[in-house]
């Protein structure tokens, strides 16, 4: 019988904190500047300069810790992580080792269904070990100079929050679900812009396998700097296959650091994996211990936004939307704000139709144009009026879609755009019973065959008659009334 393998995954995520200046200097953190134009004497490790801790970076770490229910260390220390690399000017990185600022905590994830594997969607809680503050290194540019490597120190000293999980994830799907949940949270909190292309949010995956039922962990490989959710999933799946095949062929997994090649969709060895003692951590003598009083924590707490989970439950309770819909609507702070702005104008009675529109037509248009909800050309007030016109029977849902597209394309700024377009194009729904009866009589007379088929028991013929009636009114008839009148006349 073939061995059944269990996958063990832990993630280390580097979230670049959204401060204007670096963690230990006043140099700018702006992305995209000319190489080495945003590196000051502290970043360059010139003699005689000392680091000064950025208060904003600490407050962002506290905010994150409060959001995940962790313990904020009343006293934490910075350490020197010693290693040599050309883009590390000091010969060490300032980080935290023994006492991190954020200790423990957890994040609840929603793992989607996998129909191919026959797995239903489920919820899981991932425990965090810690989150600590550290500085980023510079960047080595290997492709810009023939036969040489360029060094750009603009990134050196940029504040990072390294967030470390327990090795509790058991599949690439769980790892991706966690990474997405974490990404959404740090962006929601405003502590990180989440731009993965610019390296603001990147993951290292520690992957190992072991026989099902074995308690001892297998030898792990660390896959570095995965900067997209797709790469994270592909890299983990490849690494799992590689390790299982290696063991089953009689080989041994070596503890090492690996890189993912997205073109070949495979991981490759980078270097042997170091342990903590290889870095010779010791307290940084240039930095005092970081002391965080309860009053500081309370000040940060008072400025915290409503968290996604709490808002999701509120949407279910207040607006009567499903838990799934509430989860989609709170997937970003901007989406949630837009939804609430629409409901505030359209009324709570229209909350469900507002949710359906945001997840349907609005989302598809956003995807079509490649823009985010905060750049939507249709204001919340404009959409609210449109939904009110559906609710009061002025227009049908089909006509509303046409009006929405018109407002979107013309980038209308007037709040009453929906009413203006309805009047200008004569789009009001025909709800007059007498007028509809006359139209339906004409449709029945012109479609005698469909009438016979319906009376013979063919339900499709009824739908064909509805279609003809809607066609005769150019889509402006009230569909419900058409349905009722047809049934009445057909007996």
UniProtKB/Swiss-Prot annotation:
<dbReference type="GO" id="GO:0050567">
    <property type="term" value="F:glutaminyl-tRNA synthase (glutamine-hydrolyzing) activity"/>
</dbReference>
<dbReference type="InterPro" id="IPR004413">
    <property type="entry name" value="GatB"/>
</dbReference>
<dbReference type="InterPro" id="IPR003789">
    <property type="entry name" value="Asn/Gln_tRNA_amidoTrase-B-like"/>
</dbReference>
<comment type="subunit">
    <text>Heterotrimer of A, B and C subunits.</text>
</comment>
<dbReference type="InterPro" id="IPR018027">
    <property type="entry name" value="Asn/Gln_amidotransferase"/>
</dbReference>
<dbReference type="GO" id="GO:0050566">
    <property type="term" value="F:asparaginyl-tRNA synthase (glutamine-hydrolyzing) activity"/>
</dbReference>
<dbReference type="GO" id="GO:0005524">
    <property type="term" value="F:ATP binding"/>
</dbReference>
<dbReference type="InterPro" id="IPR006075">
    <property type="entry name" value="Asn/Gln-tRNA_Trfase_suB/E_cat"/>
</dbReference>
<dbReference type="InterPro" id="IPR017958">
    <property type="entry name" value="Gln-tRNA_amidoTrfase_suB_CS"/>
</dbReference>
<protein>
    <recommendedName>
        <fullName>Aspartyl/glutamyl-tRNA(Asn/Gln) amidotransferase subunit B</fullName>
        <ecNumber>6.3.5.-</ecNumber>
    </recommendedName>
</protein>
<keyword id="KW-0436">Ligase</keyword>
<dbReference type="GO" id="GO:0006412">
    <property type="term" value="P:translation"/>
</dbReference>
<dbReference type="Pfam" id="PF02637">
    <property type="entry name" value="GatB_Yqey"/>
</dbReference>
<keyword id="KW-0547">Nucleotide-binding</keyword>
<dbReference type="Pfam" id="PF02934">
    <property type="entry name" value="GatB_N"/>
</dbReference>
<comment type="function">
    <text>Allows the formation of correctly charged Asn-tRNA(Asn) or Gln-tRNA(Gln) through the transamidation of misacylated Asp-tRNA(Asn) or Glu-tRNA(Gln) in organisms which lack either or both of asparaginyl-tRNA or glutaminyl-tRNA synthetases. The reaction takes place in the presence of glutamine and ATP through an activated phospho-Asp-tRNA(Asn) or phospho-Glu-tRNA(Gln).</text>
</comment>
<dbReference type="InterPro" id="IPR023168">
    <property type="entry name" value="GatB_Yqey_C_2"/>
</dbReference>
<dbReference type="GO" id="GO:0070681">
    <property type="term" value="P:glutaminyl-tRNAGln biosynthesis via transamidation"/>
</dbReference>
<keyword id="KW-0067">ATP-binding</keyword>
<dbReference type="InterPro" id="IPR014746">
    <property type="entry name" value="Gln_synth/guanido_kin_cat_dom"/>
</dbReference>
<dbReference type="InterPro" id="IPR042114">
    <property type="entry name" value="GatB_C_1"/>
</dbReference>
<comment type="similarity">
    <text>Belongs to the GatB/GatE family. GatB subfamily.</text>
</comment>
<dbReference type="InterPro" id="IPR017959">
    <property type="entry name" value="Asn/Gln-tRNA_amidoTrfase_suB/E"/>
</dbReference>
<keyword id="KW-0648">Protein biosynthesis</keyword>
